[in-house]
Curated annotation (Swiss-Prot):
Belongs to the TRAFAC class TrmE-Era-EngA-EngB-Septin-like GTPase superfamily. AIG1/Toc34/Toc159-like paraseptin GTPase family. IAN subfamily. Residues 143-146 are annotated as: G4. The gene is IAN13. Keywords: Coiled coil, GTP-binding, Nucleotide-binding. This is Immune-associated nucleotide-binding protein 13. One of its GO terms (molecular function) is GTP binding. Residues 265-328 form a coiled coil. SUPFAM superfamilies: P-loop containing nucleoside triphosphate hydrolases. It comes from Arabidopsis thaliana. Residues 15-221 form the AIG1-type G domain. PANTHER family: GTPASE, IMAP FAMILY MEMBER-RELATED, IMMUNE-ASSOCIATED NUCLEOTIDE-BINDING PROTEIN 11-RELATED. Transmembrane segments: none annotated.
Length: 336
């Protein structure tokens, strides 16, 4: 059974579960990957981009072994077109959806698309926003297996992609290849999900079973427990309190709950704003350094071109002089 959840519905679920967050550029196949993991089409996904994820959404599925898989799909959070307010709002929404903490961050890349500058900076951005330990929870997911040459493996493809090698090195080479096409064999899709969940369990063991953002999860659960206790007290008062009093208490409780959530969102937002300023500053600095390097390389190339042109002109001049001397010499030989 697959159910949906809202961003502000924080429930205490005793059953074992794993929460996975999909991150990546729009068009890389995040939603399709989420559907493959869930085993059902829950996230809207169209190759032509008719349906684009505009906000974080969560769907869940229970495996035969009883494990609940929560999958959070996100819009393109770190694209150049995303505003700071949009990025902060959706990150907060994502964190509230991940009520029990995040067990793995799935960084999704498409083998069909060229790696953009924003994608190359994704790890740096994540580390600035959430701390360097975030890399301990990242799994790199490659989509569009059909983009590989006949007989070519993912490792073969990556040999010629140093930018991907750098990302994988930071993530302990945790990677998986997904074929999200409709005609992919069920056995193949099952194997992909199995390989992914094995990596999730490796991450769990490496981090001693602690989910990422567990502190936020603990705060949410504590506040939720307080709310539930007050709800219980209100129910017990129904026998000797008027309907008007009960209604007023429920309104006050709802207000308290909303204020609690707003307080948490504001705290996260303030932290993210400061971090995003650092991200922008560092990315701008890196961009300036890259442009300066390119400028110097162009100058060197221009100097080299000018030097080659000068040498070529000297060579042509020397050849002409040699030809002229040879002509004069031939004339003298003829006279003699």
């Amino acid at each position: 059974m697959v159910v949906d959840s809202s961003a502000l519905n924080v429930e205490n679920d005793w059953k074992p579960e794993r929460t996975l967050v999909l991150l990546g550029r729009t068009g890389n196949g995040k939603s399709a990957t989420g559907n493959s993991i869930l085993g059902k089409t829950m996230f809207q996904s169209k190759a032509r981009g008719k349906f684009i994820t505009k906000e974080c959404k969560l769907h869940k599925s229970k495996l035969p072994n009883g494990l609940t898989i929560n999958v959070i799909d996100t819009p393109g959070l770190f694209s150049a077109s995303s505003t700071t307010d949009f990025t902060i709002r959706e990150i907060v929404r994502c964190l509230l959806l991940a009520k029990g903490g995040i067990d793995a961050v799935l960084l999704v890349f498409s083998l069909r698309n060229r790696l953009t500058e924003e994608e190359q900076s994704t790890l740096r951005t994540l580390k600035i926003l959430f701390g360097s330990q975030i890399v301990d929870y990242i799994i790199v997911v490659f989509t569009n297996e059909d983009a590989l040459e006949c007989g070519e493996t993912l490792d073969d493809y990556l040999e010629d992609c140093p930018e991907f090698q750098e990302i994988l090195e930071e993530c302990d080479d945790r990677k998986v290849l997904f074929d999200n096409s409709y005609n992919a064999p069920v056995s193949k899709k099952d194997r992909q999900v199995h390989d992914l969940l094995n990596l999730v369990e490796q991450i769990s063991k490496k981090n001693n079973g602690k989910s990422y953002m567990a502190d936020l999860s603990h705060e949410l659960r504590e506040n939720e427990a307080t709310i539930k206790e007050k709800q219980k007290q209100i129910e017990e008062m129904k026998g000797w309190s008027s309907k008007q009093e009960i209604s007023q208490m429920k309104k006050e409780l709802e207000k308290s709950h909303n204020e609690m959530l707003e307080g948490i969102k504001e705290k996260i937002s303030n932290q993210l704003k400061e971090s995003l300023e650092d991200v922008k500053e560092q990315l701008a600095k890196a961009q300036a350094e890259r442009e300066e390097t390119e400028k110097k390389m162009n100058e060197i190339q221009k100097l080299s071109s000018d030097e080659i042109r000068r040498l070529r002109e000297q060579l042509n001049k020397a050849e002409k002089e040699t030809a002229s001397l040879r002509t004069e010499l031939n004339k003298k030989c003829t006279v003699l």
